[in-house]
């Protein structure tokens, strides 16, 4: 795949970043509906943009619906129940494979921020830690009950990929348990022994560790799976017809997110304050651990890097979530909407 498009995007977006996403004053208010999966950290900018008044600055009245899985976000987008999906790229590839057209219009997280988190009981029994060899860790998952948010999710995709690396079959060699997105309930389920571990997004890893319920066992965004480094995961997407009909509103939304991402990088104290508001389960030690992992993969602007996209595409082809052909960067990423959002003054 030639990445000349990426270089052009990078130069334009880099110049736009220098402008630090100035406020956009709008006289009229436009209503827009969005969806997201629970309150994982990828969607923190969605919350922060509202708290900072950036939607209002952009002339938007944003209604947010939280869903228990990315599959449900995708269903809401393609059924016109919401205008924009804030989700994982897994859902986008799954929709495209099912011939339900959508386009990427922005980025929320430039790392696979889903971890395998295992219970203290499992760790004690196996004597394994995150520092153990990757294949030893994957093989130790054989026969275990592993929680996922739901079928077809990014949490399932991670389990599928890891098992494939070890020559295992996740449908035969493990029991995948649908646990939804309620973090407190998931931790209680793991503590009680009803599941041995869970595949789940940040900040659950940090909450589990600070509450002494379990520990991060395999953390792709932190480099534990070399082949998964630097692939985009948190994304913003919409249907092509919605983009065509509501382009100014979508540009304004992505701009507000980009402005928020830039702000969070510049204001660590306010970022901590907003994280406490976003997720009341986060203690100060959990926030410390979360920020150390999250800030390196939080975009400084909402562009989508072509190399990062290509890595995500190959991952999802291997796991069967993306079709074996097509889905090129040019086909899936709406660079016009994305760059207009970045360049908006």
Where are these regions (language model features)?
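Conserved C-terminal helix/tail region of periplasmic/extracytoplasmic solute-binding proteins
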Residues: 314-345
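Short, solvent-exposed loop/beta-turn-alpha elements that line the ligand-binding surface or hinge
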Residues: 57, 123-132, 223-229, 296-305
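Short, glycine-/small- and polar/acidic-enriched structural segments
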Residues: 27-171, 175-179, 196-202, 219
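Sec/Tat-exported extracytoplasmic proteins
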Residues: 81, 86-89, 96-99, 145-150, ...
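Secondary-structure end/capping motifs
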Residues: 244-322
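Solvent-exposed, polar/charged alpha-helical surfaces in well-ordered, non-transmembrane soluble domains
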Residues: 53, 75, 79, 93, ...
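N-terminal export signals
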Residues: 7-27
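Pocket-lining segment of extracytoplasmic ligand-binding domains
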Residues: 182-277
């Amino acid at each position: 795949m030639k990445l000349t498009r990426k270089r052009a995007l990078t130069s334009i977006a880099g110049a736009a970043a220098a402008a630090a996403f100035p406020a956009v004053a709008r006289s009229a208010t436009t209503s827009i509906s969005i969806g997201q999966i629970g309150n994982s950290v990828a969607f923190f900018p969605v919350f922060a943009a509202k708290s900072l008044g950036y939607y209002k600055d952009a002339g938007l009245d944003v209604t947010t619906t939280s869903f228990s899985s990315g599959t449900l976000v995708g269903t809401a987008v393609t059924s016109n129940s919401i205008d924009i999906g804030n989700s994982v790229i897994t859902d986008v590839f799954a929709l495209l494979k099912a011939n339900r057209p959508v386009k990427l219009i922005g980025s929320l997280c430039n790392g696979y921020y889903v971890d395998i988190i295992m219970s203290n009981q499992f760790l004690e029994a196996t004597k394994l830690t995150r520092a153990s060899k990757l294949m030893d860790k994957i093989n130790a998952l054989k026969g275990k009950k592993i929680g996922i948010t739901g079928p077809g999710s990014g949490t399932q995709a991670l389990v599928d990929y890891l098992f494939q690396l070890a020559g295992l079959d996740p449908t035969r060699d493990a029991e995948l348990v649908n646990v939804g997105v309620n973090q407190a309930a998931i931790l209680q389920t793991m503590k009680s022994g009803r599941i041995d571990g869970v595949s789940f997004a940040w900040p659950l890893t940090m909450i589990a560790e600070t509450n002494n319920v379990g520990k991060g066992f395999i953390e792709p965004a932190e480099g534990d799976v070399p082949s998964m480094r630097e692939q985009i995961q948190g994304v913003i997407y919409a249907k092509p017809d919605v983009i065509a009909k509501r382009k100014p509103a979508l540009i304004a939304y992505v701009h507000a997110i980009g402005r928020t991402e830039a702000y969070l990088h510049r204001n660590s104290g306010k970022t901590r304050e907003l994280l406490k508001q976003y997720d009341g389960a986060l203690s100060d030690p959990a926030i410390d651990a979360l920020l150390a992992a999250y800030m390196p993969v939080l975009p400084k602007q909402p562009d989508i890097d072509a190399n990062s996209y290509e890595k995500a595409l190959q991952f999802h082809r291997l796991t069967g979530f993306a079709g074996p052909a097509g889905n090129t960067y040019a086909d899936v990423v709406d660079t016009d909407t994305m760059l207009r959002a970045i360049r908006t003054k």
